[in-house]
Amino acid sequence: GKNDAPAQASRPLSASAAGFIPGSGSGVLMLESLDSARARGARIWAEVLGGFVNCGGHRQGGSMTAPNPTSVQRCIRGAVAMAGILPRDIGLINGHLTATFADPHEVENWRAALELSAEQLPLIQSTKSLIGHALGAAGGIECVASVLQVARGFAHGSLNCEDLHPEVARFASSVVHQTREVPELSVIAKASFGFGDVNGCVIFKKYSA
């Protein structure tokens, strides 16, 4: 266990992951039409290009804690289509990635949904490696993290996954281990594949006046 080393306890994508670590907090974003925000001179952090929500119906392996892979992939594809972008436009994936058995399946679902090879997968990260799993608040917090990254041109590291899960190893070049500047970052995909086989994915774009 990691009781004596709490900073190493949350281990998404790791071969030694032993389940999610509860966290807490909140994340709030104000959504506003672009015309309204411009008219009042608001600071615009990012644009929401599109999103998609669905449920796997507890079928094809889906359950209270496991996602239906077909529905996960349909959710990702739906968000990309609604955003009007191509898979190659995505520069960073902020995944659900919880340090459970589902992590390798999630990474493969991203690859399959985007119809890319392992080498072509965008950068991928887990905010839960930094703060744990805030349950109902996780998606909001991770949306804030996503917006900050696309606005400021960086990707935060995923901690504690130096020992990548064997099924994730082929995606090693995409896993962000250390925080780094990514000045060319313009589109980020944020997803939550939560309890009850419920899925959500949103596409954020860097705002350019």
Language-model features: where?
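Condensing-enzyme catalytic core mediating Claisen C-C bond formation in acyl metabolism
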Residues: 5-85, 91-92, 209
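Acidic-glycine-rich active-site phosphate/pyrophosphate-binding loop
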Residues: 1-8, 106-124, 173-178
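Stable alpha-helical structural segments in soluble proteins, enriched in small hydrophobic residues
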Residues: 75-83, 109, 113, 146-149
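Conserved beta-strand-centric core segments of catalytic alpha/beta enzyme folds
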Residues: 1-36, 138-209
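Beta-strand segments within the central parallel beta-sheet cores of soluble alpha/beta enzyme folds
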Residues: 43-51, 88-95, 121-129, 157-165, ...
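Glycine-rich, phosphate-binding/catalytic loops in enzymes
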Residues: 46-47, 109-111, 206
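Short glycine/threonine-rich loop-to-helix capping motif typified by GTGT followed
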Residues: 58-69, 97-115, 134-141, 173
